[in-house]
């Protein structure tokens, strides 16, 4: 069987599992009166979303993990790369699950403490490095203008920075109905194409499994959202994306393919620096999607424009570097 056909089966499997079990989670949360607490610092009109079921990411993460494992096993391709990708998605998903669970239990918007979340994110990244190093993985990192540097210490630091950074970047982007979902479909779709060209079945099947779950999730997450992915979804998606870029030996590609995630994070950093040094804010509100909301843009307009930016930049990357 061709790698594309097998990967498409993984996509359909993940999609079907998510479509079946997501309504179950939604109904369960409604029946137990559980839902997302909306932060007071956000746009005031977001308060009407308070009580919307959350933790939807739990479903599509589990669906993707089940799908990629059984399809890879079926194709006799359940190798270390598959396990590294699964651990990144599941590991960061578990961190998000804990964060979401604390928020729901205590009926507040604060889950894990920042240092607790960071420590757990670093641990998952280190575990991935240890698994990779046990199989004579090539620890080569391309540094612009310096070439490839072979250093396990440098590579470890980079992986920690990349996984922690992008898991949080996707998390910051998950502030509007459907926004992070659409952006992630574009990014994972781009990497699926790259993996197909490289004939990398493990990464292709993984990306397609995630895409299948996200397509199904989007049915329930577009505006007005019936459920949010929560940190269980956003942290998992970001950690998975960062790991995919590394497994394809194209980590820097994520700066362009994931340009919206980068801009969302940069807007928060710049806002903090500006306010602490000058007492003035650069943006009306951060992350930057809220800035455009404050300018009068509808959620749908922000979503569509941001999705298009992500899509155009992904196409641009493929056009230049293939």
Curated annotation (Swiss-Prot):
Its cofactor is Mg(2+). It is found in: Cell membrane. Belongs to the glycosyltransferase 4 family. MraY subfamily. The gene is mraY. Pfam families: Glycos_transf_4 (PF00953), MraY_sig1 (PF10555). PROSITE patterns: MRAY_2. The keyword GTP-binding does not apply. It is a multi-pass membrane protein. InterPro entries: Glycosyl_transferase_4 (IPR000715), PNAcMuramoyl-5peptid_Trfase (IPR003524), PNAcMuramoyl-5peptid_Trfase_CS (IPR018480). Pathway: Cell wall biogenesis; peptidoglycan biosynthesis. Keywords: Cell cycle, Cell division, Cell membrane, Cell shape, Cell wall biogenesis/degradation, Magnesium, Membrane, Metal-binding, Peptidoglycan synthesis, Transferase, Transmembrane, Transmembrane helix. It catalyses: UDP-N-acetyl-alpha-D-muramoyl-L-alanyl-gamma-D-glutamyl-L-lysyl-D-alanyl-D-alanine + di-trans,octa-cis-undecaprenyl phosphate = Mur2Ac(oyl-L-Ala-gamma-D-Glu-L-Lys-D-Ala-D-Ala)-di-trans,octa-cis-undecaprenyl diphosphate + UMP. GO terms for molecular function: metal ion binding; phospho-N-acetylmuramoyl-pentapeptide-transferase activity. Its EC number is 2.7.8.13. The chain crosses the membrane at residues 9-29, 54-74, 82-102, 122-142, 145-165, 176-196, 200-220, 227-247, 255-275, 302-322. It is an enzyme of class 2 (transferase). This is Phospho-N-acetylmuramoyl-pentapeptide-transferase. GO terms for cellular component: plasma membrane. Catalyzes the initial step of the lipid cycle reactions in the biosynthesis of the cell wall peptidoglycan: transfers peptidoglycan precursor phospho-MurNAc-pentapeptide from UDP-MurNAc-pentapeptide onto the lipid carrier undecaprenyl phosphate, yielding undecaprenyl-pyrophosphoryl-MurNAc-pentapeptide, known as lipid I. PANTHER family: PHOSPHO-N-ACETYLMURAMOYL-PENTAPEPTIDE-TRANSFERASE, PHOSPHO-N-ACETYLMURAMOYL-PENTAPEPTIDE-TRANSFERASE HOMOLOG. GO terms for biological process: cell division; cell wall organization; peptidoglycan biosynthetic process; regulation of cell shape.
